[in-house]
Amino acid sequence: MSEKEAGIEVQGTVEEALAGGMYRVKVDQGPVVLAYASGKMKKFHIRIIPGDRVKLELSPYDLSRGRITYRDK
């Protein structure tokens, strides 16, 4: 990925699991964003439930949406 397309890495807590594999995540220093699990997380059936700490990658173009890249233990 080029530097222009690189996402912004942030951490947060899952507040709510929505339909269609979407999640409402409260970012530590910011607002609540809408996020989805990355392809590898879906492939390996990693479960994400409300209360989990996660790492997000936010698009520099739309900071209200993101992709969950890691679930903390």
Curated annotation (Swiss-Prot):
SUPFAM superfamilies cross-referenced by the UniProt entry: Nucleic acid-binding proteins
Database matches in InterPro entries: NA-bd_OB-fold, RNA-binding_domain_S1_IF1, TIF_IF1
GO CC term (a single one): cytosol
Record localization: Cytoplasm
Main location: cytoplasm
Keyword Cytoplasm: yes
MF annotations from Gene Ontology: ribosome binding; rRNA binding; translation initiation factor activity
Keyword Transcription in record: no
Gene3D superfamilies in the cross-refs: Nucleic acid-binding proteins (2.40.50.140)
Domain of life: Bacteria
Key words of the record: Cytoplasm, Initiation factor, Protein biosynthesis, RNA-binding, rRNA-binding
Domain named S1-like: residues: 1-73
CDD domains: S1_IF1
Family: Belongs to the IF-1 family.
Function field: One of the essential components for the initiation of protein synthesis. Stabilizes the binding of IF-2 and IF-3 on the 30S subunit to which N-formylmethionyl-tRNA(fMet) subsequently binds. Helps modulate mRNA selection, yielding the 30S pre-initiation complex (PIC). Upon addition of the 50S ribosomal subunit IF-1, IF-2 and IF-3 are released leaving the mature 70S translation initiation complex.
NCBIfam families: infA (TIGR00008)
Quaternary organization: Component of the 30S ribosomal translation pre-initiation complex which assembles on the 30S ribosome in the order IF-2 and IF-3, IF-1 and N-formylmethionyl-tRNA(fMet); mRNA recruitment can occur at any time during PIC assembly.
Protein name: Translation initiation factor IF-1
Species of the source: Anaeromyxobacter dehalogenans (strain 2CP-C)
Encoding gene per record: infA
